[in-house]
């Protein structure tokens, strides 16, 4: 479908597939809507699936600025307005999950029926005096330095951690890792680095209290990118009535490694009148 203008000189690439209940997918950093291939191949048969490339990523325009969560939330509202969307199940992965939280906090839930947070990088990542359990600033500084010096090499290492690849575990082929790498390299260098600043510095703890729709949180307990204890448990505690499903030992990239059960849980949640049962899956 055509690009949708969300701000002066900013147009976002949007795919609109299928029919039925509306499900909007927000991709993670530093990928694009194509990361949801293994979800859309199945869910697109039953639902209207809308996929958006965030500004700076995929096939969307790549402006110099606007990578903070407020601006990204405003981009979403512009897309929803252009398509006249209502009764949305909003699905956000990683940075996309944080973006979804800020969207509801900033624009309300009049368009949103349900929220799904997949490995969401929220509510807070950075260690600060009032958040001693957070990640040291030096970790994010090193990410930025490595990305600036050799983004391709950084992604090769990051991708292995992302999917839990090690000497004893190879949950995906080298070709699929190459595909993942290619999606990441379609982002602009500016968006790549500025987004690290955004997801590392953001504090969405107060936003959680504004989530007033049924919410399903799915997270891998083996996530080395967005640690389960730091994020999933905090979101579950902060979002009233939320449900948490923990994929035992699953990595951050469980949208691929656990895609059959993820698709089943998404379908159950989208079609049910209440959230599905909280559980831990191995």
Question: What is the meaning of each model-derived region?
Answer:
Residues 6, 10-65:
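Conserved HGGG/HGGXW glycine-rich cap/lid loop of the alpha/beta-hydrolase fold
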Residues 29, 88, 92-94:
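Conserved alpha/beta-hydrolase "nucleophile elbow" surrounding the catalytic nucleophile
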Residues 123-134, 145-209:
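Conserved alpha/beta-hydrolase catalytic His-Asp/Glu region
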């Amino acid at each position: 479908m055509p690009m949708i203008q969300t701000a002066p000189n900013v147009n976002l690439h949007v795919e609109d597939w299928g029919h039925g209940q509306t499900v909007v997918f927000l991709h993670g950093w530093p990928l694009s809507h194509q990361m949801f291939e293994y979800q859309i191949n199945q869910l697109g048969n039953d639902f209207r699936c809308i996929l958006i490339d965030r500004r700076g990523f995929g096939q969307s325009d790549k402006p110099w600025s606007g990578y903070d969560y407020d601006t990204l939330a405003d981009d979403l509202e512009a897309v929803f307005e252009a398509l006249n969307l209502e009764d949305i199940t909003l699905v956000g992965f990683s940075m996309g999950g944080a973006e979804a939280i800020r969207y509801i906090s900033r624009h309300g839930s009049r368009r949103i029926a349900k929220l799904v947070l997949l490995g969401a990088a929220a509510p807070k990542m950075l260690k600060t005096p009032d958040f001693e359990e957070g990640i040291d600033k030096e970790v994010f500084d090193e990410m930025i330095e490595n990305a600036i010096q050799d983004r391709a090499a950084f992604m090769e290492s990051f991708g292995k951690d992302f999917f839990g690849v090690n000497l004893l575990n190879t949950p995906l082929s080298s070709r699929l890792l190459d595909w993942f790498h290619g999606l990441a390299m379609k982002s602009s260098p500016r968006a790549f680095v500025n987004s690290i600043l955004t997801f590392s510095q953001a504090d969405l703890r107060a936003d959680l209290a504004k989530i007033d729709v049924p919410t399903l949180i799915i997270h891998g307990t083996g996530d080395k990118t967005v640690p389960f204890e730091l994020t999933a448990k905090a979101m579950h505690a902060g979002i009233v009535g939320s449900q948490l499903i923990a994929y035992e030992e699953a990595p951050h990239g469980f949208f691929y490694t656990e895609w059959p059960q993820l698709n089943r849980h998404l379908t159950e949640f989208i079609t049910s009148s209440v959230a599905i049962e909280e559980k831990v899956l191995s």
